Swiss-Prot record:
PANTHER family: DNA POLYMERASE III SUBUNIT EPSILON, RIBONUCLEASE T
A GO BP entry: DNA replication proofreading
Residues the entry annotates as binding Mg(2+) 2: D23, E25, H181, D186
Molecular function per GO: 3'-5' exonuclease activity; magnesium ion binding; nucleic acid binding; RNA exonuclease activity, producing 5'-phosphomonoesters
Entry superkingdom: Bacteria
Protein's name in the database: Ribonuclease T
Protein family: Belongs to the RNase T family.
Lineage: Bacteria, Pseudomonadati, Pseudomonadota, Gammaproteobacteria, Alteromonadales
UniProt xrefs under InterPro entries: Exonuclease_RNaseT/DNA_pol3 (IPR013520), RNase_T (IPR005987), RNaseH-like_sf (IPR012337), RNaseH_sf (IPR036397)
SUPFAM superfamilies named in the record: Ribonuclease H-like
């Protein structure tokens, strides 16, 4: 089968977009004024059967940018002490340079043309990521400037629940509420949930589309 029509390749699954699962922990809800404190990024891969799975995860504690607002209620909620030296925090720029390098390498390996953020309530994470990139004056961001895959929406459709913990449990994905609100933990659970939904849709016959399958069959007949 020609690579052009192989629906089991990641580059054909999302119109050439490479999905990158992201979760952030912050010191508030305003991406312009409130600090980004933690970020985790999970890269995905697709096997020869077209099943999506986790590849690897990057994780960074972030130093608040100069003049950043730190909302006490937000810090109490996520349990982060921005001044704790044991966090091993790095600057936003250092973190995003490493993230850019890793995601661009994975995107290229998958032969995709751009990355797209996957997140639970994705507008929030996308907003903080975009603003941090802007603050750092980083050029050539690998991420689409506005399109995202929101697992809250996808889970509502596919599973019937929009809360991450509930959706994971309903999908058979273990979820420990004591570990929640850690970017590392939440990102990997979000990645598992996204993979579950994508793979389940395939198993139910939703992918590849009949038109695409017909094109593949026609090409196979021509080659024979």
């Amino acid at each position: 089968m020609s690579d052009i029509c192989d629906a089991n390749k990641l580059k054909h699954r999302f119109r050439g977009y490479f999905p990158v699962v992201i979760d952030v922990e912050t010191a508030g809800f305003n991406s312009q004024t409130d600090a980004l404190l933690e970020i985790a990024v999970t890269l995905l891969k697709m096997d020869d059967e077209g099943m999506l799975g986790i590849d690897k995860t990057l994780h960074f504690h972030i130093e608040p940018f100069e003049g950043a607002n730190l909302e006490p209620a937000a810090l109490a909620f996520n349990g982060i002490d921005p001044n704790n030296p044991l966090r091993g925090a790095v600057s936003e720029k250092e973190a995003f340079l490493d993230i850019f390098k890793a995601v661009k390498k994975a995107q290229k390996a998958a032969d995709c043309h751009r990355c797209i953020i996957v997140a639970h309530n994705a507008a929030f994470d996308h907003g903080f990521v975009s603003k941090a990139i802007e603050r750092c004056d980083l050029k050539r961001s690998p991420f689409h400037p506005f399109a995202t895959f929101d697992t809250a929406t996808l889970a509502g459709l596919a599973i019937g629940h929009t809360v991450l913990a509930k959706a994971c449990m309903m999908a058979g994905i273990p979820f420990d509420n004591k570990e929640a609100h850690s970017a590392l933990y939440d990102t990997e659970r979000t990645a598992e949930l996204f993979c579950y939904i994508v793979n389940r849709w395939k198993q139910l016959g939703g992918w590849p589309l009949l038109a695409a399958a017909g094109a593949q069959d026609a090409e196979s007949d021509t080659e024979e």
